[in-house]
């Protein structure tokens, strides 16, 4: 099976696996324990925080580890909203966010917060004017993902930072699909989230960063771990492996960019010959991501045919694909249900070979030839 679903998850690299096994074997203590074994684990945790902080140019005091980016989104957004609710209860996001973000805002609506969904253009992008038109006197937080997992569109977060600072509004971003692959304006953010398994790290580990200068309130009371941000013993082997994955992604970024750009242009050239539509922004996008529609074919059909031919692709974000309903992002960008049903996603990585990619291109050509339907 040729794997082309890197936006859903990525394989752990050999280096990351080695780090995980080594730390799991040698540093198995509870970092909250007061004996030497616990101290060794705690020391690994603090070393990892410092290493990540150096790579991302953030304060290690604001780093918290969670069980996933989904959990990190919930805890970060809720903790910030609770801490600032006396100032206001108005929150802003978009309908193009990851399901974990959308469900978090639905939860906050049930807790008497008021949520506005800023409109996006046909590429899923937010304009400064649209955002400014949504801000109110009681707005306390804006959450906009840096890159959209279904469409692949990258948001120009830096253009929002200045007006949000002017109005003293917190700025959160889900950077799960971006960090390690493209540049992210982290210094413009008050908080961000990311995931281990999206950058060739382990599953079951996410990261939340909240600027230590920003007040937050624990979602659960009485929690002693990680300053009360998240309950439970920190998984030190996963933290170490996650750190190694971030480190590796930064070290190999130039080689990654060259490889991904080559495959990107190769596929885009071929697309010009096909009855195919690229969703999301044509240029300001993740280069390893293609959100596509083939005229006259359902995405589910394309995905199943690809699977039968030995290629793993998807019909959208894996966190919502089991619901068998179009992602709300399609309604947000003005697509009909029929158009949304045509969607499928191809995403590749550093391990994807040119030979594998050419084989997938040949598969799509054969599929289109069988259909024989003009644009």
Swiss-Prot record:
InterPro entries: Aminotrans_V_dom, Cysteine_dSase, PyrdxlP-dep_Trfase, PyrdxlP-dep_Trfase_major, PyrdxlP-dep_Trfase_small. It is an enzyme of class 2 (transferase). Signal peptide: none annotated. Pyridoxal 5'-phosphate binds at residues 69-70, 177, 195-197, 233. [2Fe-2S] cluster binds at residue 319. Keywords: Iron, Iron-sulfur, Metal-binding, Pyridoxal phosphate, Transferase. It comes from the Bacteria. PANTHER family: CYSTEINE DESULFURASE NIFS-RELATED, CYSTEINE DESULFURYLASE FAMILY MEMBER. This is Putative cysteine desulfurase NifS. It comes from Halalkalibacterium halodurans (strain ATCC BAA-125 / DSM 18197 / FERM 7344 / JCM 9153 / C-125). The lineage of its organism: Bacteria, Bacillati, Bacillota, Bacilli, Bacillales.
């Amino acid at each position: 099976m040729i794997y082309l679903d890197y936006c859903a998850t990525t394989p752990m690299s050999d280096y990351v696996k080695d780090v995980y096994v080594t730390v799991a074997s040698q540093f198995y203590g509870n970092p909250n324990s007061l004996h030497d074994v616990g101290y060794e684990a705690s020391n690994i945790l603090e070393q990892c925080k410092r290493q990540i902080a150096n790579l991302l140019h953030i304060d290690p005091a604001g780093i918290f580890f969670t069980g996933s980016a989904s959990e990190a989104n919930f805890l970060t957004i809720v903790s910030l909203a609770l801490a600032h609710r006396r100032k206001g209860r108005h929150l802003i996001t978009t309908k193009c966010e990851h399901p974990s973000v959308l469900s978090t805002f639905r939860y906050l609506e049930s807790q008497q917060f008021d949520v506005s969904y800023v409109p996006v253009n046909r590429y899923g992008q937010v304009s400064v004017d649209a955002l400014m038109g949504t801000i109110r006197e009681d707005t306390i937080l804006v959450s906009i993902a840096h890159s959209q997992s279904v469409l692949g569109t990258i948001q120009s977060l830096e253009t929002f930072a200045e007006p949000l600072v002017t109005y003293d509004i917190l700025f959160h971003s889900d950077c799960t699909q971006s960090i390690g692959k493209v540049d992210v304006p982290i210094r413009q953010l008050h908080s961000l989230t990311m995931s281990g398994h999206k950058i060739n790290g382990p599953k079951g580990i996410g990261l939340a960063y909240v600027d230590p200068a920003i007040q937050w309130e624990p979602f659960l009371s009485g929690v002693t771990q990680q300053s009360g941000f998240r309950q439970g013993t920190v998984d030190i082997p996963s933290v170490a492996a996650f750190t190694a994955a971030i480190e590796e992604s930064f070290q190999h970024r130039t080689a990654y960019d060259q490889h991904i750009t080559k495959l990107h242009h190769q596929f885009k050239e071929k697309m010009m010959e096909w009855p195919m539509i690229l969703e999301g922004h044509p240029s300001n996008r993740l280069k390893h991501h293609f959100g596509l529609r083939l005229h006259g074919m359902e995405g589910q059909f394309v995905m199943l045919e690809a699977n039968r031919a030995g290629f793993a692709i998807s019909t959208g974000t894996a966190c919502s694909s089991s619901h068998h309903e179009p992602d709300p992002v399609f309604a947000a960008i003005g697509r009909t249900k029929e158009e949304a049903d045509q969607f499928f996603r191809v995403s590749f990585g550093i391990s994807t070979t040119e030979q594998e990619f050419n084989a997938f291109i040949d598969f799509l050509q054969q599929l289109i030839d069988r259909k024989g339907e003009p644009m």
